[in-house]
Amino acid sequence: MTGRNKAHPFCLWMLSAALGVLSMAVRAEGMRLPLPSPGLMPNPAAGKVLYEQSCASCHGADLKGSDKGPPFLHRVYEPSHHANLAFQLAVKNGVRAHHWQFGDMKPVSGLTPDDVAHITAYVRAEQRRAGIR
């Protein structure tokens, strides 16, 4: 192999296996994945407004966290560790505390999958600005 990462095929296989397991778990639970509308172009500006209304009180107006919730401007939330679907699932189902000591996150009512896609686009844009890729 010339300059290619030999782990790449293994990583793709692991990702595929993980998605397969997730898919089976979702079917077993009778849940539907919260997905944005087909063709939606997530808008960071719209996401900023929604973030300020629904997320900033815990995750900080500056995305740097608060005494109630963790920062999104942190490597833990980079796309390779928390994919965009993780944001959708967190809003829909809540999250058990696993990286931080803030306690469990409850589901967030009143946000659609499209809203969450806009919020995620805003968070990702701010992460890129902060050098988190």
Regions found by a protein language model. Name each.
Residues 27-31, 44, 58, 76-77:
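Short low-complexity stretches enriched in small and charged residues
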Residues 37-38, 42-44, 48, 64-92, ...:
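Gly/Gly-Pro-rich "capping" loops immediately C-terminal to redox-active cysteine motifs
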